[in-house]
Amino acid sequence: MLKFTVIAGLNDKDTKQQEITTEKAIEKIVDVLYLAKVEGATLTEVKGLYIHEDGTAVFENSIKIELLFITEETAKNICKDLKIELNQEAVVLEVTELNSDLI
């Protein structure tokens, strides 16, 4: 089984500042997950460092999203949608193989 961990920063890629509240960003993330027909996810507020393509470094609020029981294609589509919804240069997608089940 694969576990997908997505990390999305909350600073706008153009202004390099957080333009929407963390709560509003979480609402947008939940909407993306709902439209992707994800049946469950764990969201955690974290802090992250990101170096933009122009070399600017930012320390930003981020959301870590842990997903099970979906396909890699679905995970990649979620990342693409989050890049648009949150106006990001990039979104992290980590894929881990593990043994997990709902009990």
Give a label for each model feature.
Residues 1-103:
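Positively charged, small/polar-rich N-terminal and surface patches that mediate targeting and assembly
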